[in-house]
Amino acid sequence: MSSPWSLFDDHLRLAVRLTPNGGRDALDGIEADGEGEAFLKARVTAVPEKGKANKALMLLIAKSLRIPKSSVSLVSGETARKKILRIDGDPEDLVKKLEIFLG
């Protein structure tokens, strides 16, 4: 399985599959879709209206990685379950944090 992130010079991009109204805010590990593309499974308690679930996702990622919430932005998938997030910072350091958090 491939990894759900792509490294760039000053950031990484993270593929996420978000479940809104998920009962609790949590990152549930890495999975692959039918085409074999990896994504991070995430769920939030926020409802999918007016960007609330997207904001909750970005806050969850920032808290989980212990980075400023301003470092996380949505690249694509505003109204879709599959999203691409941009996380600003040293990509190698961010990957280490993701790997530690996801165990």
UniProtKB/Swiss-Prot annotation:
Q: Which SUPFAM superfamilies match?
A: YggU-like
Coiled-coil ranges from the UniProt annotation: none
Recorded hits in HAMAP family, A to Z, give: UPF0235
**NCBIfam families, per the entry:** DUF167 family protein, PRK01310.1
Q: Which family does it belong to?
A: Belongs to the UPF0235 family.
Full protein name: UPF0235 protein RL4503
